[in-house]
């Protein structure tokens, strides 16, 4: 498998926010990665003593066959797996949680989201919102799928603490109005 990075950290947002995890970051399209065997990655998981393993990056679908073997091995180590992706590619992988990060002005993979839910996958949607236009587009898109509201997080968009806080105030009011969960992003809360 090609791996861009292996690191330990806290899960930044969503249902498992704040949980310690081992992150296996896959290279994006056109990026280089270091070739690692499944056994080597399982050893890294075992040595990390983390109960959660997050697999993220741009080439999840490209490495699906190796990931199936890796996910099975991680399960044998009694760890939970999270796949973080944008949901545009349908992945047939046995992860404990599919954490889909969405941006309203992009194309929403409604069919894939519904297919994940229909297949019994546990799915959470983390939707990064910046303004009223984002909110309107999101509310329309959400009417077309069957993810429970308890698994939908509205996350404040922002590249710095000031814009993050401004969006958090706006979103808190909208979450109250529409009944969605306001998500937090630890990197801003912790000032990292």
Predicted regions mapped to residue ranges:
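Conserved Radical SAM active-site core
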Residues: 1, 5-11, 20-97
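Short secondary-structure boundary/capping segments within folded domains
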Residues: 12-16, 173
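A generic structural micro-feature
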Residues: 16-18, 119
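Conserved AdoMet/S-adenosylmethionine-binding subsite of the radical SAM
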Residues: 42, 61-192
């Amino acid at each position: 498998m090609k791996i861009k990075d292996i690191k330990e950290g806290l899960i930044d947002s969503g249902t498992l926010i704040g949980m310690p995890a081992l992150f296996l970051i896959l290279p994006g399209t056109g990026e280089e990665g270091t070739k690692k065997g499944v056994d080597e990655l399982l050893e890294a998981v075992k040595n990390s003593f983390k109960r959660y393993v997050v697999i993220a990056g741009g080439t999840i679908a490209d490495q699906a066959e190796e990931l199936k073997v890796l996910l099975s091995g991680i399960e044998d180590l009694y760890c939970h797996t999270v796949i973080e992706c944008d949901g545009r590619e349908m992945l047939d992988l046995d992860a404990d949680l599919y954490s889909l990060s969405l941006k309203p002005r992009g194309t929403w993979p409604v069919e894939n989201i519904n297919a994940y839910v229909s297949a019994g996958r546990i799915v959470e949607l983390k939707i990064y919102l910046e303004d009223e236009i984002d909110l309107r587009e999101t509310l329309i898109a959400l009417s077309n799928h069957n993810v429970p509201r308890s698994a939908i997080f509205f996350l404040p968009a922002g590249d710095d603490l000031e814009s993050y806080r401004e969006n958090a105030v706006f979103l808190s009011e909208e979450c109250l109005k529409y009944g969605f969960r306001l998500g937090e992003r630890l990197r801003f809360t912790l000032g990292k």
